[in-house]
């Protein structure tokens, strides 16, 4: 697994400019401390850390990628959250669909293109299941079912 966890995927290097990231307290970004984050100030890119550690949740993300990650989570989480024990199976399915090792099948390690692919795969799976699901606000043009309709 070590060989696939590059400095970019570990949040140590900015994927936009190639500079080393800086470890700071998240209060500099959010006004409240949620723990440490890695940041590239030049690119306004940052990523949080696992609770109580300085291990990043993935790659640094600029505004576009942060939005893409939120959107991917919005759809993927609807596949497993109704039944929490499905999380591992959902991520194993996603790993197979993306053709990447399970160990790096994390939205936090994804780029914009991969986040969009994850959202698309999750939407397809939700439609396949025939369940109502909530759409992301900017996806209003999608012809998909909205929860409660």
Which role fits each region the language model picked out?
Residues 1-54:
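N-terminal cysteine/histidine-rich coordination modules
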Residues 1-4, 27-30, 59, 81, ...:
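A general structural-boundary detector
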Residues 18, 44, 83, 98-102:
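Glycine-centered loop/turn motif at secondary-structure junctions
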Residues 44, 48, 52-56, 70, ...:
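Alpha-helical context
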Residues 54-96, 105:
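Extended interfacial segments that mediate partner engagement and assembly in macromolecular machines
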Residues 90-125, 129:
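Short, compact, well-ordered microdomains
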Residues 123-149:
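Long C-terminal interaction/binding lobes of large macromolecular proteins
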């Amino acid at each position: 697994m070590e060989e696939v966890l590059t400095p970019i995927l570990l949040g140590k290097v900015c994927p936009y400019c190639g500079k080393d990231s800086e470890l700071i307290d998240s209060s500099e970004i959010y006004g409240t401390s949620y723990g440490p984050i890695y940041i590239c100030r030049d690119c306004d890119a940052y990523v949080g850390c696992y609770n109580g550690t300085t291990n990043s949740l993935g790659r640094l993300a600029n505004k576009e990628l942060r939005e893409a990650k939120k959107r991917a989570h919005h759809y993927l989480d609807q596949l497993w959250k109704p039944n929490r024990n499905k999380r591992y199976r959902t991520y194993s399915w996603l790993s197979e669909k993306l053709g990447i090792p399970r160990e790096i099948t994390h939205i936090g390690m994804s780029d914009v293109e991969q986040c969009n692919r994850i959202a698309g795969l999750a939407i397809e799976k939700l439609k396949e299941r025939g369940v109502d699901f909530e759409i992301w606000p900017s996806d209003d043009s999608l012809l998909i079912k909205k929860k409660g309709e």
